[in-house]
Amino acid sequence: MKIKNGIVIEDDFLSTFQELLNKDTSAKQCLELSTCFDELLSHVNIVRRTKRSLIEKYAKKNNDGEIQSDEKGAILFDDGEKKQKCLSEINEILNESIDIPLSETVKIYTDEIMTPRKVRLLKDVIEIVEREQPEKEKVKEK
């Protein structure tokens, strides 16, 4: 199963994914989710460090070698070409996908409460399904 780097490095992705660790599911899927979470933690750190090193490579620096930013916190560059090259390389990394060891999607019932943000972050690892009705209710419907 694949997830884009741009999703996994979003601030609340890991905490949202971690909520899946509290979901009742098969032992196999619990183990896979736990393994995925550990791998994602490591991967997020690598992607963030890589992004930071690209910024350090291209950004404008002061006399102390620190990255300069404007009053709004936006990083400054010596020229538009360096900024474009930096953004291009960062976007290339963010568009790459990580392959996570999850053999099947996590089932989320249609009546479970989630936010649109959580669904967007987890859309590659969840499947929204109808809750199965007990046999008695199925017979009544006929």
Question: What kind of region is each of these model predictions?
Answer:
Residues 1-142:
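A composition-driven surface/loop motif
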